[in-house]
Regions:
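N-terminal nucleotide-binding beta1-loop-alpha1 segment
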Residues: 1-25
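A short, N-terminal amphipathic alpha-helix
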Residues: 37-54
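Short beta-strand/loop segment that forms part of the nucleotide-sugar
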Residues: 54-63
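Short phosphate-binding loop-to-helix
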Residues: 69-106, 195
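Short aromatic-hydrophobic micro-motifs that form the base-stacking/packing surface
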Residues: 108-110
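Conserved donor-nucleotide/metal-binding helix-loop-beta segment in metal-dependent transferases, i.e.
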Residues: 116-141
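Short, glycine-/small-residue-rich phosphate/pyrophosphate-handling segment
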Residues: 153-172
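Conserved alpha/beta core of the MobA/IspD/sugar-nucleotide pyrophosphorylase nucleotidyltransferase superfamily
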Residues: 173-246
Length: 246
């Protein structure tokens, strides 16, 4: 148990509400569909993080009146760090600080928008992280999907501007300026478009029809109304979805 508490996985979680989804994501998929896609990505990331037996899990959650807890994500209602400042960079710094305050020696932040993240990569990050080494996982678009640090290395997050754009490159440059070695986990992709959504779907042998093509969604919208939204709020953590019929 002591070794498990030495490691902490951090995951930022937002409620399944359209106004809590990034504008870029809503532009790519439409407000309602973006909410469903984002929730499925969060469920997959949460399942991976919760199932990682070699660490404790810290969830940074921006609760709302409609979703004051995480029962929509997990019926066991896991505890969470309540977000005071919704700005992503502040949330990340607060989560890392709490992880170390509660006794963790290493903390690894994972981002849910990279659906091909593997637990093996998280293990590699924990093994590599030290006071002299930061672990960074990059997406093909230059953003980061994983960041592993010790308390000694939190200084690379002190200056604003590390979350957006080509953030993996920015973090790596900051680490090197602080005389840290950068350990890179395998490159993957962030799901931000129809193309990457299909890429994720096609990477699975069996996927359920959770992500219908916009035309299919339009055809079924009048029949289903708000039924899908209600199910999403009550959804339990599910295994990776099966591929929908073309």
């Amino acid at each position: 148990m002591s070794q498990k508490r030495d490691n902490c996985i951090i995951l930022l979680v937002d409620p399944p509400e359209a106004d809590k989804i990034s504008q870029e994501f809503k532009t790519a998929f439409g407000p309602e569909r973006a909410t469903h896609v984002n929730s499925d990505l969060l469920s997959a990331a949460y399942k991976l993080a919760k199932g990682f037996s070699e660490s404790i899990l810290l969830l940074s959650y921006l609760k709302t009146q409609r979703h004051p807890d995480l029962t929509w994500l997990d019926p066991e209602d896991p505890g969470f760090l309540e977000v005071k400042n919704p700005a992503s960079e502040d949330r990340i710094q607060d989560a890392f600080r709490l992880a170390f305050f509660t006794g963790a020696k290493k903390a690894v932040l994972v981002r849910h928008l990279s659906p091909e993240l593997k637990s093996e990569w998280v293990s590699l990050a924990f093994e590599a992280v030290s006071d002299k080494t930061a672990a960074i996982g990059a997406n093909q678009d230059g953003s980061f999907y994983l960041l592993g640090l010790t308390q000694q290395n939190l200084k690379i997050l002190e200056t604003p501007g590390f979350f957006h754009g080509k953030s993996a490159e920015s973090l790596a440059e900051r680490a090197k300026k602080n005389k840290l070695t950068v350990f890179s986990t395998p490159e993957t992709y962030a799901l931000t478009s129809e193309e990457t959504l299909l890429k994720w779907m096609e990477s699975k042998e069996t996927l359920p029809p959770l992500f219908p093509h916009p035309r299919e969604a339009a055809q079924h919208e009048t029949k289903k109304g708000h039924k899908h939204h209600t199910h999403r709020q009550e959804a339990q953590v599910q295994p990776p979805p099966e591929k929908p019929p073309l």
